[in-house]
Amino acid sequence: MHKTASQRLFPGPSYQNIKSIMEDSTILSDWTNSNKQKMKYDFSCELYRMSTYSTFPAGVPVSERSLARAGFYYTGVNDKVKCFCCGLMLDNWKLGDSPIQKHKQLYPSCSFIQNLVSASLGSTSKNTSPMRNSFAHSLSPTLEHSSLFSGSYSSLSPNPLNSRAVEDISSSRTNPYSYAMSTEEARFLTYHMWPLTFLSPSELARAGFYYIGPGDRVACFACGGKLSNWEPKDDAMSEHRRHFPNCPFLENSLETLRFSISNLSMQTHAARMRTFMYWPSSVPVQPEQLASAGFYYVGRNDDVKCFCCDGGLRCWESGDDPWVEHAKWFPRCEFLIRMKGQEFVDEIQGRYPHLLEQLLSTSDTTGEENADPPIIHFGPGESSSEDAVMMNTPVVKSALEMGFNRDLVKQTVQSKILTTGENYKTVNDIVSALLNAEDEKREEEKEKQAEEMASDDLSLIRKNRMALFQQLTCVLPILDNLLKANVINKQEHDIIKQKTQIPLQARELIDTILVKGNAAANIFKNCLKEIDSTLYKNLFVDKNMKYIPTEDVSGLSLEEQLRRLQEERTCKVCMDKEVSVVFIPCGHLVVCQECAPSLRKCPICRGIIKGTVRTFLS
C-alpha cells in the first residue's frame, strides 16, 4: 500500500478508448446495473468518475472527460454533475463552457479545484496508480464530503514510503482527538455505507478508524490520520502503524487477534440492511436494530442470523433488544464481544445462569415427547419460590381474573422473563402475548392431531424415543429393510451401521425414522413384529414402555455433555455432517448448521422452533 496524492489525471487515451476499457470492467458493470451504487467508489479517482458517464446524454456540448477531470461525476439526472469534493452541482451545459473554469468561478474554495489549478500551472500532473491515500488532516466525525480535502496534495512526498509530509502536517494541527469516535462501537456504526467486502468494518473500527467517505476513506479518531484505496491483503492495524506510528491510540492499545466470520458477505451494516427489504411490518423489532446487532434477515418469517457466529433467532416480541438476545444466546460471539464488551455479555449471562443447562436437560427428557414442546424452566430449587413471585404481580393476577388458563399464563410469563429479564408491566402487553400464545397453541394442536391421525405408529415411536434407545437391539435387520424400501439411501444406511455400539445404532435409527416419517414407521413396526415380538407388544399393543436412566451425566461439564452428544450423532436430515444446532425451546440437538434453517419444527418432538443456538467446542 502506497501513500500518493489523490489527484489522478489520465492524459493520452481518447475518451472512447477509456470508455470501452471501463465497460469491460466490473466497476462499470456495477455502475450500469444501479446508479444508486455510485458512492461505492472513491470519486477522488478520475477513472472512477469517468465510469459514471456511461449513461451521460449524447447531445451535451461538453465532453465527459473534461467534466471528470474537473472533479465532477455524473448524477444520473439529465446533464447534472456533482463535485466529489465540495459537492457543487451543475447542469444545463452550453457550448464553450469550461468545467474547470466554471468550477473555479462558482466554488473557488474547493480544495480539489485549487490543487488542480496549481498542479496544472506547475506542470506537476502525473499518472499515478490508485494506491492507498494517507492524509493526516484534522477531521470531525462527519460524512460531509466538503471537509475531506482540507490540505494540499503538493505537500505529500512523491516517494510512497516517505511519511515526513504526514508527520509534518499532523504535528501542525490542533488536537485531532474525536471523543465521539473514541469507542469501537461508535466507530463501527459509521460504516453503514462501507463499500468493500474484503476488509471488514469491525477490523477497521478495532484499529481506531471510523468511516468518513467518499469511497473507502477512513480516519483515526485519535490522530486524525486518513487512509483510502484499501487493497485485499491490507491489515488495518498494520497500515495504521505504518503511516501514523506516533498515534496515541496505537501506543496505548494492545493489538488483539482477529476473529472469524461465518458469512463474509454480511459483515457490513449496509449489506445486512439490504436483506430486510421484505421484513414483515408486523414484527415489533426494527431492521436497523437487528442489523446493528450483527443480524441479517434470511427471508423466512422473522428469522435472522448473525454474520459472525451464525446464531439464529426468531419469534421476536415487543420490547426485545437484539443486543441483549445476542448476548443471552450467543455469548461467545466475537463480534458481540468486540462491540459491546465482555462486561455487557457477562451482565446479560448473569440474568440467565442456567440457560444452557436447561436446554441440555430438555434435550433428552422422559415422558410424552409428542406433547407440547417443553418450556425452559427455572433451575432446581428455584421454581416454587420464583413461580410464586412472578404469578402474584398485579398484571399477572389481572390476566388470571380474565379467565386465561393458569398454565398458559405461567408459561408465557416464564418465556417473557427468560427473554427480557423482567415480567410484564402492563395488562395490554400480557393479554396480547396470551392471545398470541393461544393461537399458536391451537395451531400446534391441529397439526399434531393431523399427524397422529395420519400415523399413530409414528407418535408412539416419538413418545417412547428414549426407551427405544435402551431396548432396541435388532437394529441391522430394520436398517436393511429401510434401505431395500428406498426410505433411506446407502450413505445413511452405512453411517448408522458403522456405529460401534448397539445403543448408538439404535439412537441413530430411531431419530432417522422420526425424520423420515410414516413410511419409515410402518417398516419399523412390521420388522419389529417379526424380529422382537416382546418389544413390539410393549410398544404398539400395550403401549407401556418404560425408560430407566442408566447414566447420570449431570456431574459432567456442559462442554463434555455437548461433546458426547456430538460424538454420538450425525445430522438427522442430511445424515452427513455432525449435529451442531440446539433448538429453542425444546433443546434437541439433532441437526447440523446447514440443515437447521430449513426446519420450522423440531423433527424429534415436532415442537415449533423459536430460535437456534449453535454449539462451539474448543
From Swiss-Prot:
UniProt PTM comment: Auto-ubiquitinated and degraded by the proteasome in apoptotic cells.
Gene Ontology annotations for the cellular component aspect, listed alphabetically: CD40 receptor complex; cytoplasm; cytoplasmic side of plasma membrane; cytosol; nucleus; XY body
InterPro entries: BIR_rpt, BIRC2-3-like_UBA, BIRC2/BIRC3_UBA, CARD, DEATH-like_dom_sf, IAP, Znf_RING
GO BP annotations, alphabetical order: apoptotic process; canonical NF-kappaB signal transduction; cell surface receptor signaling pathway; necroptotic process; negative regulation of apoptotic process; negative regulation of necroptotic process; negative regulation of ripoptosome assembly involved in necroptotic process; non-canonical NF-kappaB signal transduction
Gene3D superfamilies, alphabetized: Death Domain, Fas, DNA helicase RuvA subunit, C-terminal domain, Inhibitor Of Apoptosis Protein (2mihbC-IAP-1), Chain A
EC number: 2.3.2.27
Sequence ranges assigned to domain CARD in this UniProt record: 453-543
Database matches in Pfam families: BIR, CARD, UBA_BIRC2-3, zf-C3HC4_3
Transmembrane segments annotated in the record for this chain: none
MF-aspect GO terms: cysteine-type endopeptidase inhibitor activity involved in apoptotic process; FBXO family protein binding; identical protein binding; protein-containing complex binding; protein-folding chaperone binding; transcription coactivator activity; transferase activity; ubiquitin binding
Segments annotated as BIR repeats: 46-113, 184-250, 269-336
Residues where Zn(2+) binds: C306, C309, H326, C333
Major localization class: cytoplasm
KW rRNA-binding (keyword) present: no
Activity regulation field: The CARD domain inhibits the activation of E3 ubiquitin ligase activity by preventing RING domain dimerization and E2 ubiquitin donor binding and activation. The CARD domain-mediated autoinhibition of the E3 ubiquitin-protein ligase activity suppresses cell proliferation and migration. USP19 regulates the stability of BIRC2/c-IAP1 by preventing its ubiquitination.
Keyword field: Activator, Apoptosis, Cytoplasm, Metal-binding, Nucleus, Repeat, Transcription, Transcription regulation, Transferase, Ubl conjugation, Ubl conjugation pathway, Zinc, Zinc-finger
The reaction(s) this protein catalyses: S-ubiquitinyl-[E2 ubiquitin-conjugating enzyme]-L-cysteine + [acceptor protein]-L-lysine = [E2 ubiquitin-conjugating enzyme]-L-cysteine + N(6)-ubiquitinyl-[acceptor protein]-L-lysine
Quaternary structure annotation from Swiss-Prot or TrEMBL: Interacts with DIABLO/SMAC and with PRSS25; these interactions inhibit apoptotic suppressor activity. Interacts with CASP9. Interacts (via BIR domains) with TRAF2; the interaction is required for IKBKE ubiquitination. Interacts with E2F1, RIPK1, RIPK2, RIPK3, RIPK4, BIRC5/survivin and USP19. HSP90AB1. Interacts with UBXN1. Interacts with GSK3B. Interacts with several death receptors, inclusing FAS, TNFRSF10A and TNFRSF10B. Recruited to TNFRSF10B in the absence of receptor stimulation. When TNFRSF10B is stimulated, further recruited to the receptor and cleaved by caspases.
Summary of the function given for this chain in its UniProt record: Multi-functional protein which regulates not only caspases and apoptosis, but also modulates inflammatory signaling and immunity, mitogenic kinase signaling, and cell proliferation, as well as cell invasion and metastasis. Acts as an E3 ubiquitin-protein ligase regulating NF-kappa-B signaling and regulates both canonical and non-canonical NF-kappa-B signaling by acting in opposite directions: acts as a positive regulator of the canonical pathway and suppresses constitutive activation of non-canonical NF-kappa-B signaling.
Entry domain remark: The BIR domains mediate nuclear localization.
Name of the protein: Baculoviral IAP repeat-containing protein 2
Organism, scientific name: Homo sapiens
